[in-house]
Amino acid sequence: PYFAPPRVERSEEGTWSLDARADRLYATMSEVVRQHLVADVPVGLLLSGGLDSSVVAALARRHGPVRTLSMGFADSGLDERPFGRAVSEHLGTDHEEIVIRPEEIVGSVEEAAWYVDDLFGDWGVVTTMLLYRKCRDAGVKVVLVGEGSDEVFGGYPDFASAGGAE
């Protein structure tokens, strides 16, 4: 194969109690978030109000003031702003809401295709490009997100059937 990840042997961590594992996870995540907040440019956090981004925002808030941004689509049911706003109010973050209009999406397809340099059938490419541009325009140069926990913790149904998850 082109690439095969190295096999990791079980360590003594495999015998830790659930509480010890939870403590280790919390300490590790908190430290990683703290490290990613260190920058010489403004840092923001995309806050959907879901579990992933809310956990990252809560951990970041423990280290000081946090700027959060939530996205919504004009005239659409796909609007994360109310959920992000609720979490922001609970955590006391400096919050901004970003709206993406349908005409912005349609008008940006060609540009997004140029950046991707490939055919794509996922509108998320266009909206993600617009979202990050609006973050930049709002003065946020570094953006933390809450993506990845489903992959790490087996949050997708397909992962449960993959086997090996304990």
Cite the ranges covered by each PLM segment.
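Non-catalytic substrate-recognition/targeting regions of SAM-dependent transferases
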Residues: P1-P5
